[in-house]
């Protein structure tokens, strides 16, 4: 990985606001964007499009190595472009999610996707959104942020999102799901969720998105000036 290209990593638990922060940072800095959480779904979708068996490492590794994908911040959304086509909606389909879990279980595919993610590092810079960006994927990144929020706050945010879509959900159920996922992510044997030693930890529980962006930008600008 080139030390010349500035890389900003944003890690943290589900629902902390990483996606929104990364999208806004990408726009403000003019940097490219990587949504690592979507990369397995993108590969699964590419496999479906090309008729590739989602359980065959031999077939998936070359597809992962040459995966033609871009993440584009547009308006309030991040568009996912696979082989020139906007596949943002397709990525959310249950079929894609099920195929993604099969793909993610294959060690050589994970290794190929790790290399593919690192290939996003290119001028003028990169904002990388994930759970192990600063610890595993880009350990030499110039600026590392760990964005956190209490489980209760993340459950409230998720509740509002789902209610805005007209869905009937219970706060207690969402909170349990978030706590279970946190426990899995923080205690998994490979690349557990934790801040890099040199990361700025931002707790967004009682901060607006504007405040989070302002603090993140101040930190990034100071790190890039070093």
Swiss-Prot record:
InterPro entries: Cytidylate_kin, Cytidylate_kinase_dom, P-loop_NTPase. Its main location: cytoplasm. Its EC number is 2.7.4.25. It comes from the Bacteria. Keywords: ATP-binding, Cytoplasm, Kinase, Nucleotide-binding, Transferase. One of its GO terms (molecular function) is dCMP kinase activity. It is an enzyme of class 2 (transferase). It catalyses: CMP + ATP = CDP + ADP; dCMP + ATP = dCDP + ADP. It is found in: Cytoplasm. One of its GO terms (cellular component) is cytosol. One of its GO terms (biological process) is nucleobase-containing small molecule interconversion. ATP binds at residues 12-20. Belongs to the cytidylate kinase family. Type 1 subfamily. This is Cytidylate kinase. The lineage of its organism: Bacteria, Pseudomonadati, Pseudomonadota, Gammaproteobacteria, Vibrionales.
């Amino acid at each position: 990985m080139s030390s010349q290209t500035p890389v900003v990593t944003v890690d943290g638990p589900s629902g902390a606001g990483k996606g929104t922060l990364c999208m806004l940072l990408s726009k403000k800095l003019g940097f490219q964007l990587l949504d690592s959480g979507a990369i397995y779904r993108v590969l699964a979708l590419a496999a479906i499009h090309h008729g590739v068996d989602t359980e065959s490492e031999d077939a998936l590794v070359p597809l992962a190595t040459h995966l033609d994908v871009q993440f584009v911040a547009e308006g309030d959304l991040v568009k996912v472009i696979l082989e020139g086509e906007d596949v943002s909606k397709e990525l959310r389909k249950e079929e894609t999610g099920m195929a993604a879990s099969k793909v993610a279980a294959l060690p050589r595919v994970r290794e190929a996707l790790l290399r593919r993610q690192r290939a996003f590092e290119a001028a003028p810079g990169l904002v990388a959104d994930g759970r192990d960006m600063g610890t595993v994927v880009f350990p030499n990144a110039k600026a590392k942020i760990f964005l956190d929020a209490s489980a209760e706050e993340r459950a409230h945010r998720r509740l509002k999102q789902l209610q805005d879509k007209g869905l009937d959900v219970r706060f207690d159920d969402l909170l349990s799901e978030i706590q279970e996922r946190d426990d899995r992510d923080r205690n998994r044997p490979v690349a557990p969720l934790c801040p890099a030693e040199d990361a700025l930890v931002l707790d967004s529980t009682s901060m607006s998105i504007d405040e989070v962006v302002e603090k993140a930008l101040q930190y990034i600008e100071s790190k890039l000036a070093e």
